[in-house]
Amino acid sequence: MRLVDLKIQDVAFGGKGVAREQGKAVFVPYTIEGELVSAEIVREKRQFAEADLVEVKQSSPNRVAPECPYFGRCGGCAYQHIDYEHQLAIKWRQLRDALQRIGKLKDVPMRPIIPSPRQYAYRNRITVHAQDGVIGFFRRESHRLIDIESCPISREEVNRALAELREQKHVRDGHYTLRSASEPRVFSQVNDEVAQALRDLIVGLVPPNQELLIDAYCGAGFFAKALLGKFERVIGIDWDRFAIAAAKENASEKETYIAGDVESELTRSDGFLAVEGETRRLGSRRSMTLIIDPPATGLTEGVRKAITDLAPETLIYVSCNPPTLARDLKELQHKFVINSVTPLDMFPQTAEIEVVAHLEAQK
């Protein structure tokens, strides 16, 4: 380990500041571009090194005091030391850079980032871990727990649930998901206000009077049910049978929800999709919209091929991982035109970015 003085040049996706030292990149957490810092090299590889921040010698005007007493130890937040407007600018730039560097996409029509109305107290659920009497979150880049009494980015109801858990005399080792009272027990977005903005954005991007919507990775139908008025037929697919069961509750005749693997359903029988005993040729449907909201790993090669084979008129790609989005758009651009890419700040104070890409089939 050695101590070095560094000038931070950028903030990389993931939240760490980037400097150069002896010809290699050095990643330093809790820093801002333009800052002069003292850091201790803790891991050194051939092409890069990682360091811990020791002292900020020349601070950025965008540096602020974090609101959480656990910031810097807890692994949840990365940006509490940065004022909110600059957090938004960093995330927008990180998305643009990923599209250019990984996706080789030039002149992408990026829209302004949609901010969160709440910068703190926005999370409607958290998952805490309990071990040997300690209840909290994992430390940064560690499997060791840090004891947490409250979480400032979580709603008051969630923190009350955490306090109630901590008051129990005997808490078994394991993990506990604490929710707001109205929060469903299937997957949903953690920031209610930005989730609504996300849904409104997608509703605005989808043209009216369409024949078919396929909502892949649909969950409980958050997008599909908001779009019912624009389609004759709606099909949702998700591996989570509990989410599909929730989607089926009060579903109309035009809605069909399938518990299954997205790749298997989209590629079944050479481009056919089984729907309640019928087999419908989807590849011939031009008046079709496909929404894909995959996990952070992005699309498999099979799903990408199924999308190009289906050739939907409108394709909406919702992503929580700019690098995998960029990788997938690099392939999809051969069959689709990218109309817009819109980032949303679903997770203030963290390094996470939500993105919506709007594509249309090439004519």
Task: Show where each model-derived region lies.
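Terminal RNA-binding accessory module
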Residues: 1-70, 142
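Residue-level signal for inorganic ion chemistry
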Residues: 19, 34, 77, 321, ...
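Short nucleic-acid-contacting surface segments enriched for D/E, G, S/T with interspersed K/R
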Residues: 31-38, 160, 164, 168
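Extended interfacial segments that mediate partner engagement and assembly in macromolecular machines
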Residues: 54-66, 72-166
